[in-house]
Amino acid sequence: QGLISFPRV
C-alpha cells in the first residue's frame, strides 16, 4: 500500500 497507515492501539 502506498498510503501511510498509522497503527491503531
Curated annotation (Swiss-Prot):
Keyword annotations of the record: Amidation, Neuropeptide, Pyrrolidone carboxylic acid, Secreted
Gene Ontology, cellular component aspect: extracellular region
PTM annotation (Valine amide): residues: 9
Entry's localization field: Secreted
Main location (coarse class): secreted
A biological process term (GO) from this entry: neuropeptide signaling pathway
Modified residues (Pyrrolidone carboxylic acid): 1
Pfam families documented for this protein: Periviscerokin
Superkingdom field: Eukaryota
Purpose: Mediates visceral muscle contractile activity (myotropic activity).
Family: Belongs to the periviscerokinin family.
Protein name per its UniProtKB record: Periviscerokinin-1
Lineage: Eukaryota, Metazoa, Ecdysozoa, Arthropoda, Hexapoda
